[in-house]
Each structure stands twice: as C-alpha cells, then as structure tokens.
Amino acid sequence: MKFLDIGLQEDNENLLIVDGLNVAFRYRYAKTPYYTNQYVQTVESLAKSYNCGNIIVLADGGSVYRKNLYPDYKANRKERYKDQTDAEKKDFENFMGEFVNAFKRLKAKGHLVLRQRGLEADDLAAWIVGKRKEFGVNETWLISSDKDWDLLIADDVSRFSTVTRKETTVENWDEHYRFDRDMFLTFKCLAGDVGDNIPGIKGIGPKRAEILIKEYGDLFDIYNACPIDSKYKHIQELNENADRLLLNAELMDLESYSEQAIIESSMDLEDLSSQVREYLNGSS
C-alpha cells in the first residue's frame, strides 16, 4: 500500500529512506522512554514534507563484510558499553523494545521495513539508491544524521538530519564541505572514522586531507604518488601506510561494495530486489 493518504500527489514516485536506529537514538538522547508513536509520526511527517509516496525504513544488523575485512571494526563501541550498570542495561533494553514496536507499527501501516543480520542500514540504503532508476524512483530523501550517507548524494538524492535539522543536497554541498562530492570518499579514507574505529593516516586530519586532495587528487592518485618526498611526519606516515587507503576504501565505499556486503550477510539479492520492487510498484 503506497503512502498516499496524507495529501500527497497521486502516483508519487519519490522515496524516503530512513536510517531506522539512527533516528531512534534522538529519542534516547532526549530521554523519551516511550517513543513508538512519535517515531511513526516523525517518519510519516517527513514523508509528507518531502512529498515522498514511498517509505523504506532500514535497521542495522552488524556487518559481516566489514568484520571480515577488519576485525576491529566498531570494536570501540563494545568498550563503551562494557561497564554498563544493570539499570543502564535495562534502559537500553526498553529503548530497543520501543524501536522494535515502531518497526512493527510501520510495517503494519504498509511501509517497507528491512533488516538483515550481519548487514548495516548503510549498505541497504546504498544498494537501493544505486538501483533507484531501475526501480522507477524520481527523487530520494535519506533521513539520517550519519554523514557517511553523504557518499550517496546526487542530483536526485539528498539527506536530512533529524539532529541538526539541516539538509545536504547537491545545491548546498559547498556549505558543508570544502571539496567536491567525488572527493568525499578520499577525504574519509585519509582522515579515518573514529566513530567506526577505522583509523586514517596518523597525523592527517580534515585540513591536511583537504590539502592532499587539492595537490594530488583522489585516493588512487595519492596512493600512486607514494612515496612522496617530504620531511613532514604525516607524509612519511602516508608513505609507510599507503595501503591503508585501499583498505579504508573497501570499508567505506558504500556505492562500490554494498552488494558485496549484502551477499556476505547471506541476504538473497533476488528476494531483496523483489521486495523493493513489489513495494514501490504496489497498488496505491
């Protein structure tokens, strides 16, 4: 059942893709213990705001693909929670219970919800975005505060953060970043991702990453330029750890490796494609 009962244009082919758990955490940080109804209302309100006749909500199930490549992927998160008190554990269980209830409610209302053990929402989003033309989607809005999803930004794909309340689009890209969209992956590979426990090149933060991009180009240009003659310590670190750029690309390049991540999670690609296609082409 398409989401056309709230005054949207008929035959609407726009798509809202929601980073399910990411959006739920706004209620945890706001200390809202019972948020199922608010969650559903927020998702549907955003669909109305962006004139999206289709809603797909995604949940995280870990990442077999990235763990196989790099066993320490997100290992810092386990450290963060290992000393939880019983009360904190109970609070988190309640939070996840509300999230499960919200997922069930969204599914009952006819929206498509997807979760696969061993697969991250990022990969599902990237795969769907990559197939959007094949699925007949006009415009796509990504709902997440995770800037990793900016790797998917295109003329017809934009992101809204429920945390900052800001949009990231092709038109306002320069307001958010000081490099072109096609250099975002290179920037991430150089600087790393602390939140996901992916190290970059030691000594290279955002400013130095931007300088290297301007001087050499993308990550493969930088890799091929190594060893770079320099007295600077961070360049010497780059020379010694240039292979890190290639590993980071495999870990972070959602567009290139989402399908591989899906396969390694044991999710059936044909079944996934059928679910998405049937939902998007379902009767209104």
Descriptions of predicted regions:
Residues 167-177:
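Short, charged, surface-exposed secondary-structure boundary motifs
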Residues 122-131, 178-188:
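Short, motif-level signal for alpha-helix interfacial/capping segments enriched in acidic residues
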Residues 155, 174, 202:
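Conserved, surface-exposed functional patches that form binding/active-site neighborhoods
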